[in-house]
Amino acid sequence: MFDVKAWAVYIVEWAAKDPYGFLTTVILVLTPLFIISAALSWKLAKMIETREREQKKKRKRQENIVKAKRAKKD
């Protein structure tokens, strides 16, 4: 079975013995994840903006329809 305590001790020893190698490895592992996170955040922001624009357009259209119906009645 996987021993978490032994693994954690190994990581701490590695970081203590070779801090620059450890930090380089951590940065190399995390950089792609940060890039993916940034890309997905940007994509989500664009989707939210598009949805808000569409909702605003629909709301404006509905308001104009109501105004036109009121004007017809008068």
From Swiss-Prot:
<keyword id="KW-0812">Transmembrane</keyword>
<feature type="transmembrane region" description="Helical">
    <location>
        <begin position="20"/>
        <end position="40"/>
    </location>
</feature>
<keyword id="KW-0175">Coiled coil</keyword>
<dbReference type="InterPro" id="IPR027877">
    <property type="entry name" value="Smim15"/>
</dbReference>
<keyword id="KW-1133">Transmembrane helix</keyword>
<dbReference type="Pfam" id="PF15086">
    <property type="entry name" value="UPF0542"/>
</dbReference>
<dbReference type="GO" id="GO:0016020">
    <property type="term" value="C:membrane"/>
</dbReference>
<protein>
    <recommendedName>
        <fullName>Small integral membrane protein 15</fullName>
    </recommendedName>
</protein>
<keyword id="KW-0472">Membrane</keyword>
<feature type="region of interest" description="Disordered">
    <location>
        <begin position="53"/>
        <end position="74"/>
    </location>
</feature>
<feature type="coiled-coil region">
    <location>
        <begin position="48"/>
        <end position="74"/>
    </location>
</feature>
<feature type="compositionally biased region" description="Basic residues">
    <location>
        <begin position="56"/>
        <end position="74"/>
    </location>
</feature>
<comment type="similarity">
    <text>Belongs to the SMIM15 family.</text>
</comment>
